[in-house]
Amino acid sequence: ALWNSLESGVLSAILATIIGATLALVIGLTDVRLKGPLVFLVLLPMMIPPHVTAISWIQALGPSSPLLRSLGIAPEIGSTHPLYSREGVILLLALQHAPLVFLVVRAALRAQPRELMDAARIAGASAGRVLTRIILPLLLPALLAGYALAFVSALGNFGIPALLGIPARYTTLPVLIWQRMASFGVGMLTNVSVIAMIMAVVAVVAVTILYVLQRYGRTALTGPPRPPLAISLG
């Protein structure tokens, strides 16, 4: 269970960081339309309990899904649901926690000095070069902070691993705590306390490591609030 928690936490946090940071860059730096509704849609998973998210995706990708049936790719009735797997747990954890990364990165983008980006564009740098040479290095502390939030949130998530992991025999520490509590066996409270302590130690160690990395990558470049870049998407 400890390995499964670490694996799902690390991998889902990486995926959540990629998704959340990409959405923050697209919404914060381009001229994409309807930014307000897009931000709401990105943040929507945070407003939905994890177990409800899992149930929704199970129905959306199941044999009775109207969309998949219309496309002719719905799983056969009686077959194993594709989300009942290690990959399904990691994917939904990433989707659930990507908004956390989005909020952190978007806030960091709004605090970056616009002058550096404007100077690079005036000097003839392409949008891709500005992104890789200026924006991403300045965002490194925010990316690490977003990753830490996603990892700790995934480590303590119960709803998604319970609904998707138990059928696949993929047990994480929160699920193991629930199973121990439901058993009402001798020494149940002791077992639960030990497991909870392990989770706390893992979370503290992970956050401490990322804090140290942040200190080495920290920048003090901030600027007054100004309109963000609006890189044309064509």
List each language-model region with its residue ranges.
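Transmembrane alpha-helical segments of polytopic membrane transport and secretion proteins
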Residues: 128, 210-234
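Glycine/proline-centered hinge or cleavage motifs at structural transition points of membrane proteins
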Residues: 123-125, 137
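Peri-membrane helix termini and adjoining interfacial loops of integral membrane proteins
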Residues: 62-74, 166-176, 217-225
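Short amphipathic alpha-helical coupling elements at transmembrane boundaries
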Residues: 39, 69, 73, 114-122, ...
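Short coil/turn motifs that cap or connect alpha-helices
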Residues: 33, 125-126
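Membrane-water interface segments at the C-terminal ends of transmembrane alpha-helices
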Residues: 1-110, 138-159, 163-165, 192-212, ...
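Glycine-rich helix-loop "coupling/hinge" segments at transmembrane-helix boundaries
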Residues: 159-186
